[in-house]
Amino acid sequence: ALQVLSFDLPGHGGRKDEPAPCRIQVCVPELKAVMGYAKKRWAHVGLFACSLGACFSLAAYADEPLEQALFLSPVLDMRRLIENMMGWFGVTQERLCRERAIETPTGETLYWDYYCYVKEHPVRRWDTPTSILCGVRDELCEPDVTARFARQYGCRLLTRPEAGHYFHTPKELEALRQWLTASL
């Protein structure tokens, strides 16, 4: 029997109205605290993470002996995502360095210190047996990034041609259910 322990990132789910920023420097210590809690209670710990949660989990849990990881629409290269966002909104590195924080038209904020952090701390290790489900039409996480990560770290990769970043249609949710059932 599985026991599920859920954690929302700042600004998401049950923490939607929290003022804490959803940044790797904030979330990694929180994720490490959650892992400490889980390891005190259960001998076998696995991970399910989606989007930014996967990115932050890669940073927090690289040295953890996890049974397995399941990633849904994972952000696997935060540097590339930030640089893509900078390009979409015409923000140069020089401007971001000078202004330190720039709010985008989508409501997301680009931060210089965050950008520097992800440049200095790319994923260097991931030994956990991992399965990834993502959409071919993912507008945030480019398929080549996901495929390269899967090859580099020996992950099982399943792509859905009809899906984008957010799995939400009945067909996408059914694909998610089938993937979870097959993976567990």
Language-model-derived ranges and their functions:
Residues 1-17:
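Conserved alpha/beta-hydrolase
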Residues 49-57:
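Gly/Ala-rich beta-loop-alpha elbow adjacent to hydrolase catalytic centers
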Residues 12-41:
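Catalytic nucleophile-loop/oxyanion-hole region of alpha/beta-hydrolase
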Residues 8, 51, 136:
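Nucleotide-sugar donor-binding loop of glycosyltransferases
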Residues 60-61:
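Aromatic pocket-lining residues of Rossmann-like dinucleotide-binding sites
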Residues 26-30, 110, 172:
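Soluble or luminal CAZymes and related metallo-dependent hydrolases
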Residues 44, 65-148, 152-159, 164-167, ...:
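The alpha/beta-hydrolase serine catalytic core
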